[in-house]
Amino acid sequence: MDPEPTPLPRWRIFLFR
């Protein structure tokens, strides 16, 4: 969902939390 190509999307981190 992030415009910039990140190695670990923030939305994924939130899901893991």
From Swiss-Prot:
The gene is mgtL. Makes mgtA transcription sensitive to intracellular proline levels. At low levels of proline this proline-rich protein cannot be fully translated, and stem loop 'C' forms in the mgtA 5' UTR which permits transcription of the downstream mgtA gene. Osmotic shock induction (0.3 M NaCl) also depends on mgtL translation. The distance between the mtgL-translating ribosome and the nucleotides which form the downstream stem loop 'C' is critical for mgtL-mediated transcription of mgtA. Cotranscribed with mgtA. The lineage of its organism: Bacteria, Pseudomonadati, Pseudomonadota, Gammaproteobacteria, Enterobacterales. Belongs to the MgtL family. Keywords: Leader peptide. It holds the Pfam family MGTL. Signal peptide: none annotated. Transmembrane segments: none annotated. Coiled coil: none annotated. This is mgtA leader peptide.
